[in-house]
């Protein structure tokens, strides 16, 4: 066959075919049938274009003798046979000059007279089967398809054959000649049988043996083999008969497919009710730190020593009083708990040697705050299984809450830069492979963009608190241990800094199962006056505990310092995940990496450096009521990181449900934007599934409101 190809086809065509095969890693000496098919296809494309010109008036004319005086332009631009980069360049420039829609796949020709791209097919099978495969693959109304067969049949979009009868007859005659030449050498049968459908990876992948039997067994009823099913799916016409097809497949299914148009979707209904409240395990934007720079005190690194040292940097303590009571709690107990912490810290200092950990006295206020002896008594099932009216507690439906503006402010704050660095640039050995070099370059650029981000501070704070709490829960199960909330960072000048946010006191923690709860009381410093947004602090009792002098542009001002106190709880599994919060960095790095990959594949070279260093370019960050928000690549990194961190801080069943269900609607809207004419059934049911997750969670409500902004702009 290889010899035949080299004799039968023009050397230029043979050379182009060899080049094309090598580009895809195929060997013309081994895949000889494919070699022949590519040469045939190239020759048909060239013959299609030969002798066809457009004159000065744009009329199509055929000129066979080479009249050198004619000022003529070729009617067809040949795209097939060029290397990929060049071919796309040609396609792009045609699209730019003519305004025609850019095709998803490289077409074979462009027709200047009809202003359309043409896909040429040459098949050894039935023309209509091959036509359907082509149409299914390119899925574009705009590209014209023209199929020829070796038996003299042809098929074209809307039976519009583009060329005159004679030109097409020339092509058919040539194909017939090739077939006869092959047959006379005994090559035709193998060539005819070797044709596969429009190749996709799956189709080249032969399924055999057990897998083949499993595939044939797992088909819907009425299909005998995978081939049948595949042919059926490929020729599937989406509009009109899905309902019938569904009912053929199963009697149980009854669905009317409704077209999904720009006017179809409605916004998500957000719940009404009082504004939602803060529910994170620690304060975020409202946190205040007492810090020491370049710590070098005795016992540096032991949390209790660090905490006492930080407390000593502040001189404005005063008699605490309650400024915002907790609606349901016994507020004086919160006040007494704080006074007890101060007193016991004072006691430690009076001792000769400061202990490494501090267990609080089990006072009545702490027992109350930590729910000691509050759990209902457990009774063995054997003793009560005969009780006739044994039933589970009735639990109330959660009260609906409306979206409050504070959660958007929290998110904005999380995307901002602080003046400290919260993660170190990892010192990693020399890169061995080029891919490692690219990977570490990306990681370093990314780290530089996010190391000072507030969301990164939240990660390190979360990791520290969860680690300390889990350790204490295992090491001191019965004790009310005092756990300082600490983080470490570096200043702009590179000096180390230790920060104290407040304290946690943990309750009894006999955690046998992953979901067993340990109660804790958190006490956190803040300069935020809770009376400005009382709804945000519904779960807190807030004390005023001191006055802090702040340096401002107009000199020193004194601001009241508050302590946010609340009872909270967590479980082993939540703490384990909290300790893993650094994964948020990885998740957002991967999202950025896929953006770089997309850019690199278009430009056909690694774009990492340009991506991070081209400051003029802006990228879409998210949707807001104003429209699509854009920002620098650093802002994109920080926004993606903040989203990932908030998913961790505000993790909940409501978020799980909302993410899973809203994603389905998102995909349908994306399909509509990509002109894929999506259809849906039971859209109402999907809305119900999404909206049943919108109850009272601030992060879920914010995401739902973003989703509504997206719908508005996506469907304009």
Swiss-Prot record:
One of its GO terms (molecular function) is RNA binding. Its main location: host cell. Its EC number is 3.1.-.-. Mn(2+) 2 binds at residues 80, 108. GO terms for cellular component: host cell cytoplasm; host cell nucleus. Belongs to the influenza viruses PA family. Binds 2 manganese ions per subunit. The keyword DNA-binding does not apply. It comes from the Viruses. It is an enzyme of class 3 (hydrolase). Mn(2+) 1 binds at residues 41, 108, 119-120. This is Polymerase acidic protein. SC35 was derived from A/Seal/Massachussetts/1/80 (H7N7) by serial passages in chicken embryo cells, thereby acquiring a multibasic cleavage site in its hemagglutinin (HA) and becoming 100% lethal for chickens. SC35 was then passaged 11 times in mouse lung, yielding the mouse-adapted variant SC35M. It is found in: Host cytoplasm; Host nucleus. It comes from Influenza A virus (strain A/Seal/Massachusetts/1/1980 H7N7). Its cofactor is Mn(2+). Keywords: Cap snatching, Endonuclease, Eukaryotic host gene expression shutoff by virus, Eukaryotic host transcription shutoff by virus, Host cytoplasm, Host gene expression shutoff by virus, Host nucleus, Host-virus interaction, Hydrolase, Inhibition of host RNA polymerase II by virus, Manganese, Metal-binding, Nuclease, Phosphoprotein. A motif (Nuclear localization signal 1 (NLS1)) lies at residues 124-139. Plays an essential role in viral RNA transcription and replication by forming the heterotrimeric polymerase complex together with PB1 and PB2 subunits. The complex transcribes viral mRNAs by using a unique mechanism called cap-snatching. It consists in the hijacking and cleavage of host capped pre-mRNAs. These short capped RNAs are then used as primers for viral mRNAs. The PB2 subunit is responsible for the binding of the 5' cap of cellular pre-mRNAs which are subsequently cleaved after 10-13 nucleotides by the PA subunit that carries the endonuclease activity. A motif (Nuclear localization signal 2 (NLS2)) lies at residues 184-247. Influenza RNA polymerase is composed of three subunits: PB1, PB2 and PA. Interacts (via C-terminus) with PB1 (via N-terminus).
């Amino acid at each position: 066959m290889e010899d035949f190809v080299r004799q039968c086809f023009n050397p230029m065509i043979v050379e182009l075919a060899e080049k094309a095969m090598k580009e895809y890693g195929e060997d013309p000496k081994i895949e000889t049938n494919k070699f022949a098919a590519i040469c045939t296809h190239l020759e048909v494309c060239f013959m299609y274009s030969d002798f066809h010109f457009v004159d000065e008036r744009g009329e199509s004319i055929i000129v066979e003798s080479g009249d050198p005086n004619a000022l003529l332009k070729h009617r067809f631009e040949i795209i097939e046979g060029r290397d990929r980069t060049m071919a796309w360049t040609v396609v792009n420039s045609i699209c730019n000059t003519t305004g025609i829609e850019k095709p998803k796949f490289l077409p074979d020709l462009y027709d200047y007279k009809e202003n359309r791209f043409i896909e040429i097919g040459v098949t050894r099978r039935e023309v209509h089967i091959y036509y359907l495969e082509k149409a299914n693959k390119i899925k574009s109304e705009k590209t014209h398809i023209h199929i020829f067969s070796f038996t003299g049949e042809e098929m074209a979009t809307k039976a519009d054959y583009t060329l005159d009868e004679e030109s097409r007859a020339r092509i058919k005659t040539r194909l017939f000649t090739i077939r006869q030449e092959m047959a006379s050498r005994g090559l035709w049968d193998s060539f005819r049988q070797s044709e596969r459908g429009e190749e996709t990876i799956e189709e080249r992948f032969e399924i055999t043996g057990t897998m083949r039997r499993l595939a044939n067994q797992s088909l819907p009823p009425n299909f005998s083999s995978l081939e049948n099913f595949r042919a059926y799916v490929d020729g599937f016409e989406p509009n009109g008969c899905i309902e019938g097809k569904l009912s053929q497949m199963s009697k149980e299914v009854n669905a009317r497919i409704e077209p999904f148009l720009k006017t179809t979707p409605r916004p998500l209904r957000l719940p009404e009710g009082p504004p939602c409240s803060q529910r994170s395990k620690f304060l975020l934007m409202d946190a205040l730190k007492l810090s020491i720079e370049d710590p070098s005190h005795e016992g540096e690194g032991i949390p209790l020593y660090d905490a006492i040292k930080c407390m000593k940097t502040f001189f404005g303590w005063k008699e605490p009083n309650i400024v915002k009571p907790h609606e349901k709690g016994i507020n004086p107990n919160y006040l007494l708990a704080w006074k007890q912490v101060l007193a016991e810290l004072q006691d430690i200092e009076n001792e000769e040697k400061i202990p490494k950990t501090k267990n609080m006295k089990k006072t009545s206020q702490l027992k109350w705050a930590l729910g000691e002896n509050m759990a209902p008594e457990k009774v063995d099932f054997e003793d009560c299984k005969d009780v006739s009216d044994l039933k589970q507690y009735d639990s109330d439906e959660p009260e609906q809450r409306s979206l409050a503006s504070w959660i958007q402010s929290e998110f904005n704050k999380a995307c901002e830069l602080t003046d400290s660095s919260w993660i170190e640039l990892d010192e990693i050995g020399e890169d061995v492979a080029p891919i490692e070099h690219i990977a570490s370059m990306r990681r370093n650029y990314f780290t530089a963009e996010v190391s000072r981000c507030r969301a990164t501070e939240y990660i390190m704070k979360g990791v520290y608190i969860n680690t300390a709490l889990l350790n204490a829960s295992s090491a001191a199960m019965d004790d009310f241990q005092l756990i300082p909330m600490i983080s470490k960072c570096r200043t702009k000048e590179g000096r180390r800094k230790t920060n104290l946010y407040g304290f946690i006191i943990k309750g009894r923690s006999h955690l046998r199962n992953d979901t067993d709860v340990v109660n804790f009381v958190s006490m956190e410093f803040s300069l935020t006056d809770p009376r400005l947004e009382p709804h945000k602090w519904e779960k807190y009792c807030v004390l005023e505990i001191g006055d802090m002098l702040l340096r401002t542009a107009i000199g020193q001002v004194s601001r009241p310092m508050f302590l946010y106190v609340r009872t909270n709880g967590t479980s082993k599994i939540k703490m384990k995940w909290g300790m893993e919060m650094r994964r948020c960095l990885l998740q957002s790095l991967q999202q950025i990496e896929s953006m770089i990959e997309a850019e690199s594949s278009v430009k056909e070279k690694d774009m990492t450096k340009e991506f991070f260093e081209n400051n003029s370019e802006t990228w879409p960050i998210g949707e807001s009521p104003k429209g699509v928000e854009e920002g620098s690549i650093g802002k994109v990194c920080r926004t993606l990181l903040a989203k990932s961190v908030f998913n961790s801080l505000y993790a909940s069943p409501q978020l799980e449900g909302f993410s899973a269900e809203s994603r389905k609607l998102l995909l349908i809207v994306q399909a509509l934007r990509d002109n894929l004419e999506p259809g849906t059934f039971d859209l109402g049911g999907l809305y119900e599934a999404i909206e049943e997750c919108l109850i009272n969670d601030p992060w879920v409500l914010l995401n739902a409101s973003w989703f509504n902004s997206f719908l508005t702009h996506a469907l304009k």
